[in-house]
């Protein structure tokens, strides 16, 4: 049952091959058996089964929609009423929200059943899911490897089939990179497509929620429920609702030959994505995927994104600056961790934050406070915002000669647990191909396209697909065509064994 996609599980529910309760029980059993992966931090079986019973009642009445009764896991950055919402931090270890995030509320309104909350890097700051106050997550393909971050719990849960789908958030690649490392499909929509209300903030001008699942068609199904204007989020974009699955299975252009469904599609290949630093085994998997696209009728076009190398310093000025402001609210007074022993009020602030935040969060708060301080704002933050605009303009120039842009989601496959913990800069460099997309506010996704080589033969590779603003439906069409011709997205690791 767990090998089925959301679409297949929906058909099974409709055919009464199983009930929503049976489905939930099946996944809860798998979650319990795979506790060593540490993908989940909060599971409440009674709440899950109550939601499943309600979904069965809806289905019995002939009501419900395409997602009714289907299970999903939520990244623990989305506040969820009745569940602890921790953002992977000791600061919020016992926090229970009085309301649901818009993403959670919309998926529950669509009838989905919450399986639990997934582990994550603290306050979404990290690329390996080793920065969590609740311990590191293991990659189900190779438990000596990281699952990526910051949505590593979600990527591991979907890869190990502990959940058929999960929510994630992407600030600088935190959906796409873990999707690549864990061999699942994940999409970061255009900034503003999905409401940030109830999503614990890291960097407000970059954070964006999105789905992670087995396939592009599953992601389209989820995005239909997740996306849409929300007046409670000032960054939410007011646009007409659309069906993100409307192009799936359709030719790129009317009249295309069945064997060449993507004839007319122009795929841009940035020179900067295929230079030094790209691992040979990742390059080989990406090249094979691009050959598959050529076989489907697409044309490969060279393009340039000349400011790609500046995306790392720009991101690590802007994101920490916004984080230092957003995280100032966690002071031990209103909610969150409070030190047990302290002197005056200022001492309470200091001790509560020192005890509540982990090393990476403290590092970024210090960097952010520095670049916003008097005398440095113009030199760092303002300059970074100017270069951010240039990066966005580079993409628009590239899209004049192509329909989508492709390349690796990460320069390497997943690295070993602990391999980069002593050098945060090396961790930051791993996001070189995803950061510029986030800075520009563009939609991007990662699609499984192979595995590494040699000692990395069990570690997946992800192909990144980048679209222009609001072009998610076409991106999903392009990804879906690849997945109809290949089976990388159907590969399942043997964890947990025997369940």
From Swiss-Prot:
Q: Which reaction does it catalyse?
A: L-glutamyl-tRNA(Gln) + L-glutamine + ATP + H2O = L-glutaminyl-tRNA(Gln) + L-glutamate + ADP + phosphate + H(+)
- Protein name per the record: Glutamyl-tRNA(Gln) amidotransferase subunit A
Entries under PROSITE patterns matching the protein? AMIDASES
- UniProt-listed Enzyme Commission number(s): 6.3.5.7
Q: How does it assemble?
A: Heterotrimer of A, B and C subunits.
Question: What is the scientific name of the source organism?
Answer: Burkholderia multivorans (strain ATCC 17616 / 249)
Describe the function of this protein.
Allows the formation of correctly charged Gln-tRNA(Gln) through the transamidation of misacylated Glu-tRNA(Gln) in organisms which lack glutaminyl-tRNA synthetase. The reaction takes place in the presence of glutamine and ATP through an activated gamma-phospho-Glu-tRNA(Gln).
Q: Which NCBIfam families match?
A: gatA
Report the GO molecular function annotations.
ATP binding; glutaminyl-tRNA synthase (glutamine-hydrolyzing) activity
Kindly give the Gene3D superfamilies that the UniProt entry links to this protein.
Answer: Amidase signature (AS) domain
């Amino acid at each position: 049952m767990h090998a089925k996609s959301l679409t297949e599980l929906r058909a099974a529910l409709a055919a009464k091959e199983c009930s929503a309760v049976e489905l939930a029980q099946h996944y809860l059993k798998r979650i319990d058996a795979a506790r060593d992966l540490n993908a989940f931090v909060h599971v409440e079986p009674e709440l899950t089964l109550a939601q499943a019973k309600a979904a069965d009642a809806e289905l019995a009445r002939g009501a419900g929609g395409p997602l009714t009764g289907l299970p999903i896991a939520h990244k623990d950055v989305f506040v969820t009423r009745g569940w602890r919402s921790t953002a992977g931090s000791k600061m919020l270890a016992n926090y229970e929200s009085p309301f649901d995030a818009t993403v959670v509320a919309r998926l529950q309104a669509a009838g989905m059943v919450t399986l639990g909350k997934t582990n994550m890097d603290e306050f979404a700051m990290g690329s390996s899911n080793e920065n969590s106050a609740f311990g590191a997550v293991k990659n189900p393909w190779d438990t000596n490897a990281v699952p990526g971050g910051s949505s590593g719990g979600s990527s591991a849960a979907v890869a190990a089939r502990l959940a058929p789908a999960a929510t994630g958030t992407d600030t600088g690649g935190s959906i796409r990179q873990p999707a690549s490392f864990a061999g699942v499909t994940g999409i970061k929509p255009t900034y503003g497509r999905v409401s940030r209300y109830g999503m614990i903030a890291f960097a407000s001008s970059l954070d964006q929620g999105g789905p992670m699942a087995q396939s592009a068609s599953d992601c389209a199904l989820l995005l239909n429920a997740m996306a849409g204007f929300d007046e409670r989020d000032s960054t939410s974009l007011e646009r007409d609702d659309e069906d993100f699955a409307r192009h799936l299975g359709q030719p790129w252009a009317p009249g295309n030959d069945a064997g060449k469904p993507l004839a007319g599609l122009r795929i841009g290949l940035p020179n900067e994505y295929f230079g030094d630093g790209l691992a040979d085994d990742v390059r080989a998997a990406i090249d094979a995927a691009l050959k598959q696209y050529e076989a489907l009728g697409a044309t490969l076009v060279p393009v340039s994104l000349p400011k790609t190398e500046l995306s790392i310093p720009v991101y690590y000025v802007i994101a920490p600056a916004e984080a230092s402001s957003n995280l100032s609210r966690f002071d031990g007074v209103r909610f969150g961790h409070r030190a047990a022993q302290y002197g005056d009020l200022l001492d309470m602030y200091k001790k509560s934050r020192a005890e509540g935040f982990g090393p990476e969060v403290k590092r970024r708060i210090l960097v952010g406070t520095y670049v916003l301080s008097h005398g440095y704002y113009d030199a760092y933050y303002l300059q970074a915002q100017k270069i951010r605009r240039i990066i966005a303009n580079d993409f628009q120039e590239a899209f004049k000669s192509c329909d989508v842009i492709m390349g690796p989601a990460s320069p390497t496959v997943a690295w070993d647990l602990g391999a980069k913990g002593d050098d945060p800069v090396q961790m930051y460099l791993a996001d070189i191909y995803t950061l510029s997309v986030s800075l520009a506010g563009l939609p991007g996704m990662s699609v499984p396209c192979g595995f590494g080589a040699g000692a990395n033969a069990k570690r997946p590779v992800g192909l990144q697909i980048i679209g222009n603003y609001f072009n998610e439906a076409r991106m999903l069409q392009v990804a879906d065509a690849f997945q109809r011709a290949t089976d990388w997205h159907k590969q399942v690791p043997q964890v947990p064994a025997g369940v």
